[in-house]
Structures are given as structure tokens and as C-alpha cells.
Amino acid sequence: MRKTAITFLLMVTAAAAYAQSAYDCLLFSESNYEGTARSVAMGNAFTALGGDLGSITINPAGSAVAGYSQFTITPGLTFSASTAQGVSPFADGSLPYFERKMKSGMTTFNLPNMGMTLNWDTNRTSGLKNITFGFVVNKSADFSQDVYANGLNSTTTFMGAMAVDAAGLPASGLNANDAYSYYPWSTVVGYQSGMISTFGGYDDEYVGASELVFDNGDIVLGGDIDQTYGRRVTGGKFDYVFNLGANVSDFLYLGANIGISSLDYSYDDYFKESAIDPADFEIALDNGKYMYFNQMKYRYWYEAESSGVYAKFGAILTPGYGLRIGAAVQTPIVNNVTEWWGYSGSTEFTSSEYDGYAYSPEGEYSYNFVSPFRANLGLAYTFGKFGVISADYEYCDYSQMKFTSSGGDRDYFDEVNNIIKDVFGPQNIWRFGAEFKLGTLALRGGYGFSTSPERHFEGPYRSNFSFGLGYSSNGSFFADFAFRKNIYSNEYYMPYSDYIFDDEGNITEPVPEILITRSDWKVLLTLGWRF
């Protein structure tokens, strides 16, 4: 039985909209470098190493280390896996929703690296010995994800929450031709598709198609329903880099990048409810007839593209005795973003004459946001021609992310920017790598982890481990192979908001919370030629 606290829900909904925009900014700002198979196999701990085209986006001075020109291309596969199951709200651990543990996955092909550097020898024995020019494309983020969750529920419903959210909005307005100009699109889709409807003669009070209304005004879920949540995310972020490197006396290596950060992101999710027994969901019509709820499906999709220009500067110092020291700094990126989104909904009853469908228009909006400054340091030690070990530290303060707008949305973005400063802070990233050479072969391994950019986040955030093999011929050809496993932080997802409260505003029937665990395997093969 539900009693609703409308004002509280409106406050929560507004806060959630601001927070979502803040998290979108984080999603588009974070980097999880890929590159060549060699750099990936060694955990991308290349700030002090260089010599590999995968290292150029980490430290621009890396191009100057190799005393030759080279070309590489790296095809790769990503195997993404997710597990989803409900989280119990009770002390005894019982699950009133999403009780089934569901596994899902997807496989994507990509090209995380391609590039070429041209080395010019000045024929000097000291001073400026070599100059390198390069163009490299390296992948810096992968959004691939597939989620599927399913289970039974006998207490709450997506459509009940939607009905509460719609309270106070006139049905005549929700059904108007220009409804999408004045009301939340999700609510308009819900009403026009038949997920919610008015009751009791009211024009601004709603009930879900799976709910029953009693004479005393109580509203309850009619019976058991099967609930399904699905999500599919694709896309990635790439850095297109123009590089200049310089070798000074085989002691100091300098480099600079002009980079273009390019991102594409696609998010598509749906929520579905089906009646276990439609007879439990009897709805009386004004004409004296009855209809029975069978199933509904609600879908939301979102796509974004962004691009921005930045500069990065780096240096590598080789003081001797096998020691190498590297450092790099990257300017903030001013990103121009265009995003598109839309909603659709369908409600089906046992008699198709009552079925309803609705589709929103396609939304489009453009804005700018600034990704923060980054800096990294590295130490490495080489064992002659036998191998190397390396370690990197990278720092990025995500509280410096910022939306910018000169239009009428300035107040909205000011609110989001305040949330960003409150929620996010510095992130510390550590990367470690090792390589051991056996003639023309090389054995490699790496590990990395990062702290959370959220100030109050508890638990592990993100880590990865990797290994690989390399082959270098006596001629110009070389090939590298790498595996990397990425382990991401747990996600707790609520498909709809709490809406059943007692007279004091306490939750009496908790809505579903889904625990989503995610990891992926990456397999890369680099083919390269030196000349």
C-alpha cells in the first residue's frame, strides 16, 4: 500500500538530474590508456621508458627515445562481462526482487593503436642528436558493457513509481500535442503509452497499469510481476596526437603533443514488467468493461559525441647506471559535446484493443565542458639488454571539471559545477611494468590500480593486470601480443525511485537495488616495422 511524499520526491528528482550531469562529465574525462600490445602488457608504465608508440600519449618524450622511424598497427578484441543480482534490504538477506544471478557479456573489435614516427638524425655526436615527428592514434577509454537482470517482485512496480512522479501534472497537458515542450518526456511517454492513468475523477492523480485502487484510496500492486532490466553501452575515447620529440646528447629526451580527444558514447537501457497472472490486474473501465494488464516495456537511449584540443609536454632523463626518470603534464581539455536522447514505451493488455505505444521526439543539445589538468611521474631501471622494470604515478583532480555555457542554462550548469566540487576530488593512479628479454623474444607483465575520484567512495575502484609476449626480428619487423584484465568498481543501480512511505515519510516497501559487477578482457596484437 502506498502513501506518497510528493514534495520529497520532486526534490530527489531534481538533485538526481544535477548529479547525473556531473557523472557524465566524469565519464567523459577519465582515461584508461590502451595503446600498443607492448605498452598494455607492461601496464602502460611508460612515463620513464618511451621508445614505443603506445607511450607517446603518456609521455610525449617517448618518441625521441627510439633512434629510428617506426610504424605500428594494433587490432584488438574486448570481451566484456557483467553479473547482476538484487541487493537485499533485509537483515536476513532475503531478496524480494531480482533474486536471480544473471550473467551477460559482449565482444567488440577495435583498433586501439595506429601510428608512425619519422626520425631525423642531425649527425651530431652531442647536443641535439635526433628530432622525431609523429602522428599516433591511441585509445584512452572503452565504454563496452552489457547488463541483464531479472527477477520477481510482489510489492513495488516501475509504473507505480512513475504514477507518483506524475502527481500534480494535468492529464490534459500530458496528452496534448505539445506535451513534450512542457513536461518531463519520460512522464509523457508513460501516460501516452498507457503505463499510468488517472483515477477517482482526478485530473492530476495517477495509478500504474499494474496497480489496484481500493475504495478507501489505498493503492497496491495487483500481484506478482516479472521484472527485467537491460543495458547496452558501446563507444570509446581516442587521442589523435601530433608529436615532436628531441634527443639531447642521449641524456635528455624532450617531447610535445598537440592532441585531439575524440569520444563517442552510446547508452541504451530498458525496463520490462510482465504479469505472472494477468487476472490479478483487473482494471474497471468507465463503459463497464474490464481489461487486464499483461506487460510493459520502457526504453531510454542516449548518445554523445565530443571533441577537444589539448597540449602535453614531457621529458625523460637518463642520469646513468640504468636509471631513468620521466615526467609529463597535460593541459585541461575544452570539450565540445553534442548529445541526443529519446524515450519510448509500450503497454500491452490481454485484449490488444487497449494496447498503447508512445515515442518521444529526439532531443539534441550542445555544450562545453572542461576536463582537468593531468600530470604523471615515472621511474624505471634497465638491466642492460636483459630487461627493465618501471613504475608510474599519475594525478588528476576531478573537482576541476567544469561545464561552461553563455546561454540561458548558466544557472543550471552553476548548480552542476557546485556538485562537481563537492562530490569529486583528486585521483591517484599507479602503474607498474616489467620486461625480460630472451634473445629475439620478450616476456612482459604489468599491474595498475587507481583510487576513486569521488571524495566519499569506499572500497576498490579500478584495477588491472596484464601480460604479454614480444618478438623482434633481426630485420625491421616486430610483433607483440598482450592480454589485460580490467576490474571495475561495483555499481549499485536503482531502476526507479522509492515511492511507498508511511505518514512520517519512512520507506515501507523498498524498491529494487541491483548490484552490477563488471570486468573485461582485452586481447591485442601489434604489428610493427622499424626503418
Cite the ranges covered by each PLM segment:
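Outer-membrane beta-barrel translocator/receptor signature
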Residues: 37, 49-58, 64-154, 238
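Bacterial Sec-dependent N-terminal signal peptides
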Residues: 1-25
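Alpha-helical transmembrane segments and their juxtamembrane interfaces
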Residues: 12-13, 69, 441
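Active-site-proximal flexible loops/turns
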Residues: 9, 66, 266
